[in-house]
Amino acid sequence: WAYMGPQPAPLLPDWEAFSWDNGFTQVVLSEVPCNWFQCQENSIDPVHFEWMHENWGNRQRTGEVRFGATHLKLDFKEFEFGFTYHRVKQDTSEDDQAWTVGRVCLWPNGFFLGEHFEWRVPIDDENTLSVTWKYTRVPREREPYAQTHIPTWWGPVKDEHGRWIDTHVMNQDFLAWVGQGRIADRSRENLSASDRGIVAMRRRFFEEMDTVAQGGEPKAILRDAERNVRVP
């Protein structure tokens, strides 16, 4: 971790997942040639999963045209450290964790999906460093397991022939981000009801920029050490 802002530095959040035991953790880095903000907007766009990872992904794997379960219900909520999105699809119900818990879009550039974090770190206006922190629980027969170090490796975005890799969920996301151009032209977009989370996030960014310009502290800054304790 590196902090490059003004002093005093805020606390690094001690998210619960950082303390999970009996698992293997690794960090995967990839350089993505587009602006970081369009990457982060993808974090609060649940319906892209249906089309990118299920419909298109299924066709990539099998060659067959098979459509995944359609989204029936969506909700977006803001909380102290970001936003959550919640969904019900044709193959789930409101008892499913996808609705009761949802997924977490961490402010300002993170995403938590239950077993891994993703961060979109700006390199410059047209390039982003994708950082994935992935936890995998070891088999029960291997417990207790203590990991002594966390390996870090670079994940390629193109194969040896220069073709974009599209066989993994993260790489499919990279394609969606880069396909919008180096900097997405939002003057040509057509937002719909499923984009309410994107709209809410954009509004919050403008509000927080105004707050900082006026000398205030932005959203999700943590300074109280007594609050910076993982949920047991």
Locate each region found by the language model.
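C-terminal catalytic domain of Rieske-type non-heme iron oxygenases
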Residues: W1-P232
